[in-house]
Amino acid sequence: MPATIRRVSAADVDAIAARQAGRSGQDPARLRDRIAAELSDSTRRLWVAVVSGAVVGYARLTRHDADQAVPDAAPSGLYLGGVVVDPLLRRQGIGEPLTRTRMCAAFAEEREAWYIANAGNHASIAMHSALGFREITRRFEFPGVRFTGGVGILFQASQENSHRELPAKLTAFRGAFSP
């Protein structure tokens, strides 16, 4: 199922909040406020996947600065996270273009990209591994994240070792996280 991937606009906030509320059970109004705030946060970038005019998925890329005082802190860098796809459309090719787009944006700024996952999220791990992410450690701390079952995995991808199609797309993302 082909999806159009584009940056999030203010017009997408309600659709994203509804999608996330359906997944997490959180209050849609609070989610709307948080997502709207993310649009003006220079450390975050958000994208949506659109099929037939409807937002069917979204994802974010976040700049994380490690707290050096925290033992086992995840390293500073650009982290792929927050992928949500309509449950009826999962495993139909929507998550991969969202992930490729975020990798291109990350690689336009840095030589590596990071990703964290619950050890039980086999579908996500398989997709990210196919795109060049490799496990770094299972012993790390990331602010505000607790993993179901208690086990998370920190992954890293480098420009040199990631999928060959990515470098050709990097030009469009130059400056995405520049001051």
Task: Give, region by region, the residue ranges found by the protein language model.
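A short beta-loop-alpha structural element at the N-terminal edge
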Residues: 2-16
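Conserved GNAT acetyl-CoA-binding A-motif
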Residues: 106-118
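Conserved catalytic-core motifs of GNAT/GCN5-like acyltransferases
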Residues: 116-117, 129-151
